[in-house]
Amino acid sequence: MKYVKARVFITLKNGVLDPQGKAIGHALNGLGFASVGAVRQGKVIDLELAETDRTKAEKEVKAMCEKLLANTVIEKYEIELK
């Protein structure tokens, strides 16, 4: 069976405070990486779907994001199909 692979990038929406990103930036500066300015942190989810129709696969992944993978109140997501 053929599969469609999907990668979902989930990040905080602009304007939402990112304490983890701030902590990472502070730690990098403390390690001597002085050129690092603002840091935003997110997550990447890789999925393999038993689907041959890319349009159906994208629609299904979007539904997954809306229902579970992303908190759409504070997060945005981007889907990349392979």
Report residues per predicted region.
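Long, contiguous binding/interaction regions
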Residues: 1-82
